[in-house]
Amino acid sequence: MVFTHIPKKAELFTGIIQGKGEILFSKQFSDGLKLRVLMNELGTGLELGASVAVSGVCLTVVNFQGAWAEFDVIQETLDRSNLEMLQVGSHTNIERSLKMGDELGGHQVNGHIDCRAQILQIEQSPRNRKIWIELAPHWNRYLVPKGWIAVDGVSLTVVDVESDRFSVCLIPETLSRTTLGNATQTTHLNLEFDHQTKVIVESIERILPKFLEKVT
């Protein structure tokens, strides 16, 4: 995947998970949540204000010491994501933000979660796993077979798209390297639809009616 333009202060991710973190502390406030995450070696070189994708959610480091980092999560993010559901001891997918010169694997992920959705069905094959995820009808227009989606921060290819659900396939590397390997039918996942697809779809929806008015 080649990005045609990366702003100097881009807070971008690729959906290639670098490791798993562990929730050490979670405290609810009236307007949000504070999380402390054990990042292990991924905490090396961390700075205040750095961006880290935690289960696909772009969060800002507000405090750190050794191998852990703290993040403040606003209510709007909690409403859209599964971060509020994470318990102490839970594991999360971790990706540090993209730096100039990094390999551009996966696809462009912004860390801005669109919604959370529950796994409906899991189909296990000898080595791989297909998961079916619920899909509210108004999100359907952003998904196409073979298109991109970030699921809990993991860059995945869409396999099937139906009116109320879609599927992705997980290879052994993804199952072992990310938290998706432990996901069950009760698991809620963070979804971020491909940004370029959203821009195209929303632009067409906005412009096409005006164009049709002129030609009819």
What are these regions (language model features)?
Residues 2-216:
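Conserved loop->alpha-helix
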